[in-house]
């Protein structure tokens, strides 16, 4: 059987502040082989202290993964397994890491920020 590819579509909630700048995520799209490690980056709106990650499977609504207040990860109850990790070491940019990707990880990953 050939190697299966997973398609990762990364979009952001486009919140805006007085400058019109919004949440930025990269990469915008990611295709990974099963078993590959993936890192997704979220740049929140400047000045926002709260940051949220969500996962949206095909045909489903967004589901909560984790929540940060500055650099502190206050709730990670939604992270689905020990292969998912999130960090925000400087209280600004956050990274969601998925190790050893599996077919069921294929989803839209959303990041949002707030004051």
UniProtKB/Swiss-Prot annotation:
Pfam families in alphabetical order: V-set
Ig-like domain location: 22-115
The organism's place on the tree of life at top rank: Eukaryota
PROSITE patterns in the cross-refs: IG_LIKE
Keywords, in A-Z order: Adaptive immunity, Cell membrane, Disulfide bond, Immunity, Immunoglobulin domain, Membrane, Receptor, Signal, T cell receptor
Disulfide bonds: 42-111
GO cellular component, one term: plasma membrane
SUPFAM superfamilies: Immunoglobulin (SSF48726)
Leader sequence residues: 1-21
One Gene Ontology term from the biological process aspect of the record: adaptive immune response
Subcellular location: Cell membrane
PANTHER family (alphabetical): T CELL RECEPTOR BETA VARIABLE 7-4-RELATED, T-CELL RECEPTOR BETA CHAIN
Function: V region of the variable domain of T cell receptor (TR) beta chain that participates in the antigen recognition. Alpha-beta T cell receptors are antigen specific receptors which are essential to the immune response and are present on the cell surface of T lymphocytes. Recognize peptide-major histocompatibility (MH) (pMH) complexes that are displayed by antigen presenting cells (APC), a prerequisite for efficient T cell adaptive immunity against pathogens.
Quaternary structure (record): Alpha-beta TR is a heterodimer composed of an alpha and beta chain; disulfide-linked. The alpha-beta TR is associated with the transmembrane signaling CD3 coreceptor proteins to form the TR-CD3 (TcR or TCR). The assembly of alpha-beta TR heterodimers with CD3 occurs in the endoplasmic reticulum where a single alpha-beta TR heterodimer associates with one CD3D-CD3E heterodimer, one CD3G-CD3E heterodimer and one CD247 homodimer forming a stable octameric structure. CD3D-CD3E and CD3G-CD3E heterodimers preferentially associate with TR alpha and TR beta chains, respectively.
Name of the protein this chain belongs to: T cell receptor beta variable 7-8
Organism from which the protein derives: Homo sapiens (Human)
